[in-house]
Amino acid sequence: DVYLGQHVLPMLPAGVVGTHPGPFMSQSFSAQITVWGKGTHGSMPDKGVDPILLASNIVTRLHTVVSREIDAKDTAVLTVGAIHSGVKANVIPETAELLVDTRAYTREVSDRLRSAIIRIVEGECAAAGSPREPEITFYDEYPLTHNDPAVTTRVRGAFDAHFGDEAVDLGQITASEDFSIIPDALGVPYTYWGLGGFADWENAPGNHSPSFAPDLQPTLDRAAEAMIVAAAAWLVDGAA
């Protein structure tokens, strides 16, 4: 058995298929963080604890983790993608919520990111005099996509024969996927590749952008071709 999959991506020209053996897409997790302050009128900040200022300090500190705590030879990404707090200009609110996203290629680096988030959030809350402990919930955890080298080499050979110069090595990308959950659970080797979807790929919006609308052609036909070619590498007569 072998597991095959693909995903349209903005970092390749339309019609190009990109493979990569070994670690391909990063593992990831997200964190929902709620911190507490003490609400008060905006004209009397000394009477409260400002959770917006607290959250801002957390954001600043979190963004030093990759540059100051992770080995420069390792890949890591930490992004604060959302911060929510308050409803009025003249009211210091009770709480602030942050949403954090991380990426890494090894469990060790991922664990260091997780530990740093906990340490920094708890430390900043203590420094601010927060009236209660923060809540940190980790979610949306996706494993590393590690393409089997033998499977990938075989599929890449089929792509080279069929697509010629439009088959390339994509290299590692820091996006993440749940694709590997099923083959990992079944103990089945797999490969997952990218498919270009935009003629103007250098200015293409990223995945999950509301403007992400791949060119219908040649993307649709090339996607169908790629799946057929990859499957045929395993199903046609003479395949090992």
Regions inferred by a protein language model and the residue ranges of each:
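Metal-dependent amide/peptide-bond hydrolase catalytic core
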Residues: 53-240
